[in-house]
A protein has these predicted regions:
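Glycine/proline-centered hinge or cleavage motifs at structural transition points of membrane proteins
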Residues: 7, 66-67, 80
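Interhelical loop and adjacent transmembrane-helix boundary motif
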Residues: 104-152
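Alpha-helical membrane-protein architecture signal
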Residues: 30, 37, 41, 59, ...
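Transmembrane alpha-helices
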Residues: 47-48, 70-108
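Membrane-embedded alpha-helices of multi-pass transport/permease systems
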Residues: 31, 38-60, 87, 91, ...
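C-terminal transmembrane helix and the adjacent membrane-cytosol boundary/short C-terminal tail
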Residues: 49-53, 57, 64, 91, ...
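Residue-level recognition of transmembrane alpha-helices
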Residues: 13, 33-36, 77, 106, ...
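Generic hydrophobic transmembrane alpha-helix motif, especially the helices
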Residues: 1-36
Length: 176
């Protein structure tokens, strides 16, 4: 929970120092991805814990009571029952990543291009929509900046809508 309260710019500085300098990755898409992974890990961990807590203890005790192994109970009872909450947390974390700029500015660089082939350019600096928005505002290109902002807003709202839809769909299928 403490990690969730850390500002994203601090994660960006950590990613720049640790991944960029200490590991020698420099400004690259890989450095940005690793930093974002560490940044959203607390969110995914917390939502997964909450989803696992919502599974009734009677499911666990019932499976173990009829002789199921602990691993079989986790794989066939616990995880499928908690999957709606886990997926919702992952989708919300993706929504947070899409709108992130501070951590990426320090780790992935501020290139003016989006990579055409992700795997051949993974160790090079690249651009994202949030960084493009920042760069357009710096150059007083307000029409382009507002266009990028609208695209970002639609993407984030779409991801949040998808999370709500998936959560509702799984709850309906589960009979909740």
């Amino acid at each position: 929970e403490t990690l969730s309260g850390i500002p994203s710019i601090i994660f960006g500085l950590f990613g720049m120092v640790f991944f960029g300098n200490a590991l020698g990755l420099g400004y690259s898409i890989l450095t940005g991805a690793l930093t974002l992974t560490i940044m959203i890990l607390p969110l995914i961990t917390r939502t997964t814990q909450e989803a696992l807590k919502t599974v009734p203890d009677s499911y666990r005790h019932g499976a173990l009571g009829i002789g199921a192994t602990k691993w079989y109970m986790i794989r066939t009872i616990l995880l499928p029952s908690a999957m709606p909450g886990i997926l919702t947390g992952v989708i919300l974390a993706i929504g947070r990543i899409v709108g992130e700029s501070a951590a990426l500015l320090f780790t992935a660089g501020s290139g003016y291009y989006l990579p055409k082939n992700l795997f051949s350019k993974i160790f090079e600096s690249g651009g994202t929509l949030t960084i493009q928005l920042y760069l357009f505002m710096q150059k007083a290109k307000y029409n382009e900046a507002f266009g990028v902002a609208v695209v970002l807003l639609v993407i984030v709202l779409g991801i949040n809508g998808l999370a709500k839809y998936m959560s509702h769909r799984f709850n309906v299928e589960a009979g909740a």
